[in-house]
A protein has these predicted regions:
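Short, structured segments at the rim of ligand-binding sites
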Residues: 1-371
């Protein structure tokens, strides 16, 4: 069994360069399927998910080289439109290939996705969007098959902003005939980057950065050359860690992606120095409790909820943490209690009573954020 041994009560100091964002690079990798040619993506993090997605692109026929964060993908040799179960089951983001395959080839065959176990993350928004664009959707032997002679622009509305569906519908609609309007679209930084990159490739997307996107379909795109934006979740994790015991500087970061996290840390009594592409956080001598509710961007990210719960367990007072995105995402709470935290759960809300002196113990990791 894999394990990490942590010797605690050590002050953190120094600087760290933030990696490229996994959540940004995966849809960019999918977008290489939209057109033939050699695509260049820099600052690609070397992670299991990026390696898995690269394997998927190669199974579809793409050729690639990956070296020290630089990825080259030649999508001129795509010879399959099927994303097999063995790969898709390990990573929900594999579903991103459906939009570009459908847009470029008029057909996609993708296994129902797998991924993290907590909370429902249906692909209904994706499929309903494809249908509005004119695709026929069939479920057959665990595979979703989408076909269309030519996608046509449509008005598409999401009841709840969906990052995955927004990205998928964008990639399908840039090659559709006519105009597509997407309302209540996700506005996360990686969606903004995807829009900008698609426009640089020759797409016509208006309203970038807002929750209403207008896409005028084009006949052909050019290959991309892009550097992935910094990972706001990695950066936020280091900021929260630095607030406990330390003085650390984050480099190659975009502070505008972390406005809500910076504000919450300042409310907790932390001193931060924010520059154009760096953030320094000093430990909080008297950490104050701060309530937090997760929300879609620009709200507090659900991917930083577990880290904030851990921080608040040593704050001087009680705080309430509510997760409105994934109501069951509290597997870390029983493990923090094993360390000495005083936390009680009520549905999707955690009541944390601090301060508690946490002590080392054996704990179990159930998912990446709980770790």
């Amino acid at each position: 069994m894999d394990k990490l041994v942590v010797n605690g009560a050590k002050e953190l100091s120094g600087s760290v360069e933030i990696s490229g964002a996994k959540n940004a690079v995966l849809p960019l990798m999918a977008a290489t399927l939209l057109t033939e040619g050699e695509h260049t993506i820099n600052r690609v993090p070397d992670l299991k998910d990026t390696r898995t997605f690269l394997n998927l692109l190669e199974m579809l026929g793409a050729k690639s080289t990956y070296n020290n964060g630089d990825l080259l993908v030649d999508s001129s040799t795509i010879n399959s439109v099927e994303a097999p179960y063995d790969l898709v089951k390990t990573m929900r983001a594999s579903f991103y290939v459906m939009g570009p395959l459908l847009g470029r080839f008029g057909e996609a065959r993708v296994s129902l996705p797998g991924g993290c176990a907590w909370g429902p993350r249906p692909v209904d928004y994706h499929l309903k969007g494809f249908e509005k664009l004119g695709a026929e959707i069939i479920l057959e032997k665990g595979y979703i098959i989408a076909r269309a002679k030519k996608l046509k622009g449509a008005q598409i509305h999401f009841d709840i902003p969906s990052v995955g569906a927004t990205a998928n519908i964008l990639m399908a609609s840039v090659l559709a005939e006519g105009k597509t309007q997407i309302t209540n679209a996700a506005i996360e930084p990686h969606i903004v980057q995807l829009c900008k990159v698609l426009n640089e490739m020759g797409a016509h997307i208006e309203g970038v950065g807002s929750n209403i996107l207008f896409v005028n379909g084009v006949e052909k795109l050019s290959p991309m050359k892009v550097e992935t934006i910094p990972d706001m979740i990695e950066a936020g994790t280091f900021l929260i860690a630095g607030a406990t015991l330390g003085n650390i500087t984050l480099k190659k970061v975009d502070p505008t992606h972390l406005n809500i996290v910076i504000r919450k840390l300042e409310q907790a009594g932390c001193e931060l120095v924010v520059n154009d592409n760096s953030i320094t956080v000093n430990k909080c001598d008297k950490l104050q409790p701060v309530d937090m509710t997760t929300d879609v961007h620009p709200g507090f990210p659900t991917d930083l909820q577990a880290q904030w719960v851990a921080l608040m367990s040593v704050a001087n007072g009680s705080s309430h943490i509510t997760d409105t995105i994934y109501h069951d995402r509290f597997a870390h709470v029983p493990e923090l209690i094993r360390l000495g935290a005083d936390i009680s759960l009520n549905k999707n809300m955690a009541l944390i009573r601090g301060p508690k002196k946490l002590k080392g113990a054996q704990v179990m990791s159930t998912d990446i954020r709980a770790s």
